[in-house]
């Protein structure tokens, strides 16, 4: 345990265009090697492209895609007397959105043949429509938790 106590988390300022903290976090996750302006351009253009295809507001698409992609339950390994069990636990809201963002970006990067803007837009549209790689990932996590429901009581120890 640290002696100095817990450090207060710095608040993330909202992004300039939508005044949303979630969009700013997403931009920060898309960013590589400190190139924030490039990450902003990618995210904003992807949201514009998705809005153009779905004929809905950008922020609504983004927030719905995040809600659809975020897991409500996951498994965590817990060691009990020599055996390691995968114990299902509820996911806190911060981690929920963080995982959804991470999965969206990973799925977009895994797609091939198109610029990142188009890949990210396609992944956001898929998540908005409850289809695609990101949603499959979430369902796999839920399936794992369901399969290990018998060990749920270890989470309460």
From Swiss-Prot:
GO terms for molecular function: rRNA binding; structural constituent of ribosome; tRNA binding. One of its GO terms (cellular component) is small ribosomal subunit. The keyword Transferase does not apply. PROSITE patterns: RIBOSOMAL_S7. Keywords: Ribonucleoprotein, Ribosomal protein, RNA-binding, rRNA-binding, tRNA-binding. Belongs to the universal ribosomal protein uS7 family. This is Small ribosomal subunit protein uS7. It comes from Chloroflexus aggregans (strain MD-66 / DSM 9485).
